[in-house]
Amino acid sequence: MAKRDYYEVLGVSRDAEEREIKKAYKRLAMKFHPDRKSEDKNAEEKFKEAKEAYEILTDAQKRAAYDQYGHAAFEQGGMGGGGFGGGGGGADFSDIFGDVFGDIFGGGRRQQRASRGSDLRYNMDLTLEEAVRGVTKEIRIPTLDECDVCHGSGAKPGSSPVTCPTCHGAGQVQMRQGFFTVQQACPHCHGRGQIIKDPCNKCHGHGRVEKSKTLSVKIPAGVDTGDRIRLSGEGEAGEHGAPSGDLYVQVQVKAHPIFEREGNNLYCEVPINFAMAALGGEIEVPTLDGRVKLKIPAETQTGKMFRMRGKGVKSVRGGSQGDLLCRVVVETPVSLSEKQKQLLRELEESFVGAAGEKNSPRAKSFLDGVKKFFDDLTR
């Protein structure tokens, strides 16, 4: 099946700013995240699709490549999946074109430097409480680390890499093709200008070994789904002593049984019985700091929103704290006893006639509207 356009997946325009993309991704992630048990059978696939689109469109280089070449820009190397994956991605077009034109006209790169290590990505799931308050977590990641025997050189201890006898250290060789003299990377040393005659017994000349390492990652308070934390130099080790890549920790906040987050505000629904809704009263509501009392005024209707200032989330970038917004839901009583039913019947009888109209103004307005609608039809 053909892939959908990433902008279409997130429902944003092609000139959307990063904050719009992040907001759109968060909305879809909350809707289709596996923890939310969506009724949509394709929820998991839609979640993965949105996540892939988000990762491409929030990376400036990858977005530029996608805008120019579409999905073809990434066909030669995926985004990496699961909890952990390579931070790379698509083909590097600058390298492709540089090699082609450089080789033909003799202006290609000379001796190739050892490659910097690949970036890595780790997907970290957090509870809402952890995201709001901040947390330090230990993670274990598989990676390519510098060989501790040869210290990344690839050569056996006591020996060193030697100058390549084919290119004499230039890293390139010339080949004549018709009227052209073409330069290309030396096939013997692969453009490095040096070869290893006596390779290290542990890494077999690669300078790197597969290894798992444990890191302690400090997550700042206020992070949200889609935020990314960069750990410089904690990616794969570079080739033959080149700098290491970086590790990117991608944050995903799990669904919460009580609260929903939007920006720095928290939302929750508070059920109350119809007697309290009519007469007023006081209830306890949950916050992330504990229970607080909320005064319910008389004649409160379903949908009434109460704002508790400063009970939301503190921004990860500093500044004021968000609010907690409690939406009241008036609950219809169930499992009534005979006495309760009788009391309700008596209450219902008191609503009959003109006296009851002022007790239910919305019902009267609705019935008046229905009557007018049918009167207009019969004219």
From Swiss-Prot:
Source domain of life: Bacteria
CDD domains: DnaJ (cd06257), DnaJ_C (cd10747), DnaJ_zf (cd10719)
Alphabetical UniProt keywords: Chaperone, Cytoplasm, DNA replication, Metal-binding, Repeat, Stress response, Zinc, Zinc-finger
SMART domains: DnaJ (SM00271)
Cellular compartment(s): Cytoplasm
Cofactor note: Binds 2 Zn(2+) ions per monomer.
SUPFAM superfamilies: Chaperone J-domain, DnaJ/Hsp40 cysteine-rich domain, HSP40/DnaJ peptide-binding domain
Domain J intervals: 5-70
Gene Ontology cellular component list: cytoplasm
Cofactor: Zn(2+)
Residue spans, zinc finger CR-type: 134-212
Residue numbers binding Zn(2+) 2: C164, C167, C186, C189
GO biological processes: chaperone cofactor-dependent protein refolding; DNA replication; protein refolding; response to heat
PANTHER family in the cross-refs: CHAPERONE PROTEIN DNAJ, DNAJ HOMOLOG 1, MITOCHONDRIAL-RELATED
Entry function: Participates actively in the response to hyperosmotic and heat shock by preventing the aggregation of stress-denatured proteins and by disaggregating proteins, also in an autonomous, DnaK-independent fashion. Unfolded proteins bind initially to DnaJ; upon interaction with the DnaJ-bound protein, DnaK hydrolyzes its bound ATP, resulting in the formation of a stable complex. GrpE releases ADP from DnaK; ATP binding to DnaK triggers the release of the substrate protein, thus completing the reaction cycle.
Subunit note: Homodimer.
Domains: entry comment: The J domain is necessary and sufficient to stimulate DnaK ATPase activity. Zinc center 1 plays an important role in the autonomous, DnaK-independent chaperone activity of DnaJ. Zinc center 2 is essential for interaction with DnaK and for DnaJ activity.
Name assigned to this protein: Chaperone protein DnaJ
Originating organism: Yersinia pseudotuberculosis serotype O:1b (strain IP 31758)
